[in-house]
Amino acid sequence: KEIRSLEIGNGASRVSTLGFVRRELVRQQQAMGKKKGVVMDGRDIGTVVFPDAEFKIFLTASPEVRAQRRFEELQAKGTPVSYENTLANVRERDERDTTRAESPLRKATDAIELDNSRVTITEQLQWAMNMFNKITKQNE
């Protein structure tokens, strides 16, 4: 639960701008994924950590939708925060992560994009499973 706190998210984004931190994290993530069948989430997983992964999903949503989701999540935890500050935080983090020199956030050319702004979690899972089955059948 603590990993989803505002402070942890912001701290991770700031620390991720440091090259030596990014390189060590990539090394550790790659070690965890040596055996196939791993599912990882992160802003550079498909481009830097596992550029040769067989199946990549690039999830996206508008900053406003992501801010609303984050705002509701933080409010449910009792964290005093405004929607406006949450939206500003989402935009700042996106800017920092897309412009950092080491492992910037970008979509892998072979990733399948899903804009989940107006899609339920159940619909996202069904879509992902359908795409996975389609791709794995093509690779057999």
Residue ranges and their predicted role:
Residues 3, 9, 71-77, 96, ...:
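NTP-dependent small-molecule kinase module
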Residues 38, 54-58, 111-113:
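Short, well-ordered beta-strand core segments
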